[in-house]
Design a protein with these regions (language model features):
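Active-site helical microenvironments for divalent-metal-assisted chemistry
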Residues: 1-190
């Protein structure tokens, strides 16, 4: 936990002053309800470190400190951090690549991912209940893209058959509260 706290010390939750560590702890707590594997717990605490705090250099550091298994799980939970040209890819490219990766992800990666998406969906729901559609102004893809992504990720989890059913159902029910109608496609606005 100390490593996660240090890595994300300057980071807060999107458009808030909530320390990012709160999200990492929440994801880990959800994961702990579904497995007793310590490596999976550690990976849950570190699931955003590669994506948000240094890319592959951070993955190598995690491997040195916590082992290959933890590093592989964290890599599996991470969106692509750089394109072949060295810059961060556009939102839709990152999301589509991540969604596609779920088809061959191992069950532990899917568990961490679903716990992450559940906590994020709870945050979206709370913001939406508090602010209405203004809550979507902090999201790159706005309301339509956010709804598309959450419905699509639930669909992809279901296709794998590897996400614990109770967890999947909770993600699905939470998403349905702020996005009751499925958005079947999304194209980024240019």
């Amino acid at each position: 936990m100390d490593y996660a706290a240090r890595k994300h010390a300057a980071q807060t939750r999107k458009a808030s002053d909530i320390p990012y560590l709160a999200h990492l702890l929440a994801v880990c707590a959800i994961v702990m309800e579904h497995t007793n594997e310590e490596d999976v717990w550690i990976a849950a605490l570190l699931h955003d470190a590669v994506e948000d705090q240094g890319g592959e250099a951070t993955a190598r550091e995690i491997e040195q400190l916590f082992g290959q298994r933890v590093a592989d799980l964290v890599r599996g939970c991470s969106e692509m951090t750089e394109s072949e040209h060295g810059e961060r890819p556009p939102w839709l490219t990152r999301k589509q690549t991540y969604l596609d990766s779920l088809a061959h992800a191992e069950p532990e990666v899917l568990l961490i991912s679903a716990a992450d998406k559940l906590h994020n969906a709870r945050s979206v729901l709370a913001d939406w209940l508090r602010c209405g559609d203004d809550a979507y102004c902090k999201f790159t893809a706005g309301k339509r893209g956010t709804h598309w992504y959450y419905h699509e990720i639930v669909h992809r989890y279901r296709l794998t058959g590897k996400v614990p059913e109770l967890l999947l159902r909770e993600v699905e029910e939470t998403v349905a509260r702020f996005a009751p109608e499925r958005v079947d496609s999304y194209e980024a606005e240019t």
